[in-house]
């Protein structure tokens, strides 16, 4: 059985490390956590934690790609639903473009990718605050646009 106090300590240490914005790989995070006394931590656990807390890779002040928890994003909660992170949705004849809060694009893209072709999504490309969504062959960009709007309950 998990020790809740130890789990809380791990989460605090994990978040503190990401705030340092100096870890460019999951392996580096594993080593840092092991140095802090979490011997049973491994890359798989770090990967799950990065996903759970919405961590993204971005450039730090030294222009190095590092993992971080964007301040604007934090961890989505019931008081900050994902739809509040979507600022604008637009389309042309080929793709749908979604603008999000800074740092939220990869999280929203992951959600859209999980819906897949049955919802009309062939794939996504996400930056920091912009997502390109390509429709599956059986959907037009307009149909996909309308589906995404309804998903995030936006006005047409």
UniProtKB/Swiss-Prot annotation:
Functional pathway: Amino-acid biosynthesis; L-arginine biosynthesis [regulation]
Known role: Regulates arginine biosynthesis genes.
PANTHER family cross-referenced by the UniProt entry: ARGININE REPRESSOR
Keyword Transferase found: no
InterPro entries: Arg_repress, Arg_repress_C, Arg_repress_C_sf, Arg_repress_DNA-bd, WH-like_DNA-bd_sf, WH_DNA-bd_sf
HAMAP family (UniProt xref): Arg_repressor (MF_00173)
GO molecular function terms attached to this record: arginine binding; DNA binding; DNA-binding transcription factor activity
Species of origin: Serratia proteamaculans (strain 568)
The name this protein goes by in its record: Arginine repressor
Subcellular location: Cytoplasm
Family: Belongs to the ArgR family.
